[in-house]
Structure formats: structure tokens, C-alpha cells
């Protein structure tokens, strides 16, 4: 019996040891090279309770980050720094859970793009359907089908907004809708609309004219503009199928991309004949005057920021919501401007009475007014400085080198017309990593010379106008006073009284043999037979 008891105890010990080792292997290792938390990686990405790590995206202009449940704090200094993480309030996860989210819901984590925070919703999430605006259920009189855009290729048309839409902190009251699946937001209409300053739910070589079912329509209810590309086909690959998607611009600055029909992966769409982009972009324009040609100006467009979304996430029944972040342009006073704790180094320019980071659509005004030289440290920014003092720009340690793309165009100083064909950006001249001074106007000396030239021209024109006006007044006076001394003076010296003159060329042959007074000849009339 003792032997059996010992054998039983030994067997039980072996079983317990095996069970312990099995449990240890399952929870400590799982699969080689993976932690047990990786099994719930999708839920962790959606609800990262205590994660502090930052996943850096390989794409430029943005970075990926995970949130925790600490109270929301403003990101210090510049958001362009890659190593920062932004927390969120504790009610974030509870709100999603109360809305009926489950473990099967796949929500892309928020992505900080400096100016916007984007969130991508997949087909399994109900928000993808909630964010889609059904235009067919809207008021018929407010839904407009653009006839030209629905029957042409590479066309764009202006659309006036019934509200002010904030885009990168600038308020827009009109946009330009293009057939290529994007909205152009620039004020200067040029031939390279696809280069920058766009809102692109899906920019590609769409041609609504190849199908009768293809339409471009929009709807404005006073608080939002919805632009929908319905059943549009790619011009260079019609057999891929039709695409249906929309972009919604809300009064509060939010931008929503909704996708209903995406027959293929966006990464498979060819960009040979037209750029393929999904995201946002903005730029500032610098105007250079050409001294040699007075009526021609050269415009250089600098792209200062871009939001590039992951094209692989764009599928059927998906959506993207982009929420604007605070910018320096929203502050109207020096104190709030320099003491702001947002993601930019805000500075106050007293000459313009404007708050700015130095990089927005008013860049040329900022530089021409000497604002970079005026800016001092935040402690002395709002103090009155002596006229002779030279200001220096002081920034925090989290500064980031700005990256630009440059588009240079030349145009005459006349009102431009809407181009009938909008080519791709193959001819766009791009310069990366430009210096700060490169974005400013570098022809101040030429402008001074041009200003002096224009002043002299204006004075000459005024003198000529005065001479002509005096001649007209003298003529009118002599006509009404023929017996005055001035009238008699000019009558006695009229051209018919001038002496005969001979004009000879250098060769000695006369051009005119003799010029005789008309009054000394007898008049005659030549009559012709009818």
C-alpha cells in the first residue's frame, strides 16, 4: 500500500508539474516572440488604458500615437515633434462602450497631424454608416447636380458656402469642386490644382463623362457642405468598377470622408495620368513682381503642411473623421497669444495685430511687415520696445524644421478664368527642406526700384493730362471769344500763314518739292459721273 501511495503521489506530482509548465508556457510565451497582450492587440489599440508608447509612422508630416486615461493636457510647444504622446480624458473608453462597442469592432487609433486629429472607422464599426450622409433623403431643392462636372473630365467649379468654414485656421466662404475626387481650397486658381491646398477623400483620374450614371452633386444646409461623387469611373481603367464617396465640411471645422463603394484597393489605382491622394494639404502664396515686365507677377506656392491618410484603410463602408486642433490664428490679443499652450509656438505681431506661428496663408504679410524681427521671447512679447531696439526670435527647444513643396507659376496681373483642363502635377517644381528665409520675398531691392519707376511714370502721366486739359480749355475759350488777343495771336500764326519750306533727304532728293499756302491757290472740285 505504501508503494501504491508513493506511486500515486509521484504521478500526481508529475501531473501538477506538467500542468504548471503548460500554464507557464501559455501565459508567458504564447507564440515565439509574442506577448500574451498581443492576442488582444486590436482592442488595446482601440482602448489603450495605460499605454505610453508611441508608434512612429513612416509617412512624413504625421506620427501615430496611443492615448491613456489621464486627464487631457495640451501638447507642449510644437506638435511636429515625433516623440510626444497626447493623453485623453477618462470618459473616452466608457463613452464608446456605452454606445455598444464590442471586441470585434476595429477602430484605428487617433493620429495626430499637428493641425488635425484623424480617426478611421472600418466596415465593422457603426460609425462608418452613421457618418455617411444620405443625400437622397435631403431636401430636393437644396441638392444640386452640377451639370458640367457630371459630364466632363478634369473640370473644376466654384461653390459658394453659406457659412464660414475654418480650414487650417483660415475661414473660407467658397471652395472649388473638381471631378478628380477632391475639393480645392486655394484662392488663386492655377493649372496645378492637384499639387496642394486640397481636401481629397479620394483624388484620382475620375471621368464622370464616361458613364451616364456618374454624377457630382453637393448639398449645403447652412451648417455643412456635402460633396458626393456618385458612380464615377477611372478614365484609364473603366473596368475596375464605379466609385461612390463623399466629403462633408462642417461649420465647426471637422472634415468627414465617407466611402460607400470602393471596388478595388486604393493602393492599386494607377497614378500615371493623375495623382492619387487621400488627405489634406495647405500652402501659402508669395507674389514676386518682375521689374522687366511691369504687368507680370510670379506666384510661388509653398506647401507648409499635409495630412496623408493610409490608403490601405479606405474600403467599402469606411469613414474618416478629422477634427481640427487649435491654431495661433484663433487668438485676438497679445496676452492670450504668447501664453497659449497649444501645439505651436505662437507669436504676436503688433504691426499686423495678428497671432501666428509664422507659417500660414498670411506668410507674405508676416514677413513683409517685419514680424519675424519684432518677435521676442514670450515674457517680453507684449511689452513696448524702444524704436531702436532690435528684436530677436526666441523659440523653445521643441522646434521642428518645416518642410515645403514649392509650386511656381507666372501670370499676368489680370483677372484669371477657370481653366478648362486641369493637368497633373508632373510639371510641378518641388524643393524640399527650404530655409525660413526662402519662403520670404527676396526681391525687396527690385521692388524699391520698381516703386521709384512707377512714381516717375505716374508724375509724367499727370503732367501730360494737365497739358491736354489746358489745351482743351484754351481751345474752348478762343472758340467762344474769337476777338480776344489770344485768338487773334493764334489766327495770325495759323499754319496757312507759315512760309514755304523745303524738306530734303540726305541724298539731296527732295521729299516735298514745295509747300505752298492753300489760300494762294484757286479751289476746284472734281466731279465724277454717277
Swiss-Prot record:
Residues 1-30 form the signal peptide. Residues 31-455 are extracellular. The keyword Manganese does not apply. Pfam families: PSI. Keywords: Glycoprotein, Membrane, Phosphoprotein, Signal, Transmembrane, Transmembrane helix. The modification Phosphoserine is found at residue 507. Expressed in tumor endothelium and in vessels of some normal tissues, such as the muscle and lung. Residues 378-387 have a biased composition (Basic and acidic residues). May play a role in tumor angiogenesis. Interacts with CTTN. Belongs to the plexin family. This is Plexin domain-containing protein 2. It comes from Mus musculus. The gene is Plxdc2.
Amino acid at each position: 500500500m505504501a508503494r501504491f501511495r508513493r506511486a500515486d503521489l509521484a504521478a500526481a506530482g508529475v501531473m501538477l508539474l506538467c500542468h504548471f509548465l503548460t500554464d507557464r508556457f501559455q501565459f508567458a510565451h504564447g507564440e515565439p516572440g509574442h506577448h500574451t497582450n498581443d492576442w488582444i492587440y486590436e482592442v488595446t489599440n482601440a482602448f489603450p488604458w495605460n499605454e505610453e508608447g508611441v508608434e512612429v509612422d513612416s509617412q512624413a508630416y504625421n506620427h501615430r500615437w496611443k492615448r491613456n486615461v489621464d486627464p487631457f493636457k495640451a501638447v507642449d510647444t510644437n506638435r511636429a515633434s515625433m516623440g510626444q504622446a497626447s493623453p485623453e480624458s477618462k470618459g473616452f473608453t466608457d463613452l464608446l462602450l456605452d454606445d455598444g462597442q464590442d471586441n470585434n469592432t476595429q477602430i484605428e487609433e487617433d493620429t495626430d497631424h499637428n493641425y488635425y486629429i484623424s480617426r478611421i472607422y472600418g466596415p465593422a464599426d457603426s460609425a462608418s454608416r452613421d457618418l455617411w450622409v444620405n443625400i437622397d433623403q435631403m431636401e430636393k431643392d437644396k441638392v444640386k447636380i452640377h451639370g458640367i462636372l457630371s459630364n466632363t473630365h478634369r473640370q473644376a467649379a466654384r461653390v459658394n458656402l453659406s457659412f464660414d468654414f475654418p480650414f487650417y485656421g483660415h475661414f473660407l466662404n467658397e471652395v472649388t469642386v473638381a471631378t478628380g475626387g477632391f475639393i480645392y481650397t486655394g484662392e488663386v486658381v492655377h493649372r496645378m490644382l492637384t499639387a496642394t491646398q486640397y481636401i481629397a477623400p479620394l483624388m484620382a483620374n475620375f471621368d464622370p463623362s464616361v458613364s451616364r450614371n456618374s454624377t457630382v452633386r453637393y448639398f449645403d444646409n447652412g451648417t455643412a457642405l456635402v460633396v458626393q461623387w456618385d458612380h464615377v469611373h477611372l478614365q484609364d481603367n473603366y473596368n475596375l468598377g464605379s466609385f461612390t464617396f463623399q466629403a462633408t465640411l462642417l461649420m465647426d471645422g471637422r472634415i468627414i470622408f465617407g466611402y460607400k463603394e470602393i471596388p478595388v484597393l486604393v493602393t492599386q489605382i494607377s497614378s500615371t495620368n493623375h495623382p492619387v491622394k487621400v488627405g489634406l494639404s495647405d500652402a501659402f502664396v508669395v507674389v514676386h513682381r518682375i521689374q522687366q515686365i511691369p504687368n507680370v507677377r510670379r506666384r510661388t506656392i509653398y506647401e507648409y503642411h499635409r495630412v496623408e491618410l493610409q490608403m490601405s484603410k479606405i474600403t467599402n463602408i469606411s469613414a474618416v473623421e478629422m477634427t481640427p486642433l487649435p491654431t495661433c490664428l484663433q487668438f485676438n490679443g497679445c496676452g492670450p497669444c504668447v501664453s497659449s499652450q497649444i501645439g505651436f509656438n505662437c507669436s504676436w505681431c503688433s504691426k499686423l495685430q495678428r497671432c501666428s506661428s509664422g507659417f500660414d496663408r498670411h506668410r507674405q504679410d508676416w514677413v513683409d511687415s517685419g514680424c519675424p524681427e519684432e518677435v521676442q521671447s514670450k515674457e517680453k512679447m507684449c511689452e513696448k520696445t524702444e524704436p531702436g531696439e532690435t528684436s530677436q526670435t526666441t523659440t523653445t527647444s521643441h522646434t521642428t524644421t518645416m518642410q515645403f513643396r514649392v509650386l511656381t507659376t507666372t501670370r499676368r496681373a489680370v483677372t484669371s478664368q477657370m481653366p478648362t483642363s486641369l493637368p497633373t502635377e508632373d510639371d510641378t517644381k518641388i524643393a524640399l527642406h527650404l530655409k525660413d528665409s526662402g519662403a520670404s520675398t527676396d526681391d525687396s531691392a527690385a521692388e524699391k526700384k520698381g516703386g521709384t519707376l512707377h512714381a516717375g511714370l505716374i508724375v509724367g502721366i499727370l503732367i501730360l493730362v494737365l497739358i491736354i486739359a489746358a489745351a482743351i480749355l484754351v481751345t474752348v475759350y478762343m472758340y467762344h471769344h474769337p476777338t480776344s488777343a489770344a485768338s487773334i495771336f493764334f489766327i495770325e500764326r495759323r499754319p496757312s500763314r507759315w512760309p514755304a519750306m523745303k524738306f530734303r533727304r540726305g541724298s539731296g532728293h527732295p521729299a516735298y518739292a514745295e509747300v505752298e499756302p492753300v489760300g494762294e491757290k484757286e479751289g476746284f472740285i472734281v466731279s465724277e459721273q454717277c
